[in-house]
Amino acid sequence: MSRFIGSTFKKSRRFGFSILETGKEFSKGKKRITTPGQHGKERAKVKVSEYGQQLQEKQKVKFMYGLSERQFRNTFAKAKKMQGILGTNFLVLLESRLDNIVYRLGFSATRQGARQLVNHGHILVNGKKVDIPSYLLSVGDLVEVKASMKKNEKVLEALQNNEATLEFVKVNKNEVKGEFVRLPERNELNSEISESLIVEWYNRLIKK
């Protein structure tokens, strides 16, 4: 399955969940818990099976982080090799991706935009260009926008509008740089994610 690059609002409306984690997709008062389409309300009343709940949760988080199915599955496999709680480790790995930290630092208004900054070589890690969005950062890594992009209108606008206060990252807006201070704790991440359903989904596949 390819990476989703369509309307964020449509996906957020479908899942009743802010993929941007800001609620901006619903800022015009159009938030819906139903699925898109003329008969969304009728479909929403249908009881979702356990399988359906697991699939929906997987899709929701996959779209939120902007990963392809293969990337998502590989990240889960990597989390299984770590000590600790599998679901939490999985989310921590997703959060440790370079494109996600660029987003968390406020250098882009969306994860998709952050991914483009990385892909185009506009991001430095510890002073060196890294153009791989899936690059996993280590605690203490310094992330900054390269000099030629520090006055970019979109970057500055994103920084100005970023009101998030996350303790696992530290940002210097004046210098357009930041630090991955520590690994995030589960209570700092999206409470609307039920990672246990994703664990159950992949465990189901393994048993087949």
Swiss-Prot record:
**Subunit comment:** Part of the 30S ribosomal subunit. Contacts protein S5. The interaction surface between S4 and S5 is involved in control of translational fidelity.
User: Member of which family?
Assistant: Belongs to the universal ribosomal protein uS4 family.
- Give the protein's biological function: One of the primary rRNA binding proteins, it binds directly to 16S rRNA where it nucleates assembly of the body of the 30S subunit. With S5 and S12 plays an important role in translational accuracy.
- What Pfam family does this protein match (any one)? Ribosomal_S4
Which terms does the record give in the GO molecular function aspect? rRNA binding; structural constituent of ribosome
- Family matches, as Gene3D superfamilies: Ribosomal Protein S4 Delta 41, Chain A, domain 1 (1.10.1050.10), RNA-binding S4 domain (3.10.290.10)
The cross-references to HAMAP family, in alphabetical order and at most eight, read: Ribosomal_uS4_B (MF_01306_B)
Q: What is the residue range of the signal peptide feature?
A: none
Name of protein: Small ribosomal subunit protein uS4
One GO biological-process annotation of the entry reads: ribosomal small subunit biogenesis
Q: Which UniProt keywords apply?
A: Ribonucleoprotein, Ribosomal protein, RNA-binding, rRNA-binding
Which Gene Ontology cellular component terms are annotated? small ribosomal subunit
Q: Which gene encodes it?
A: rpsD
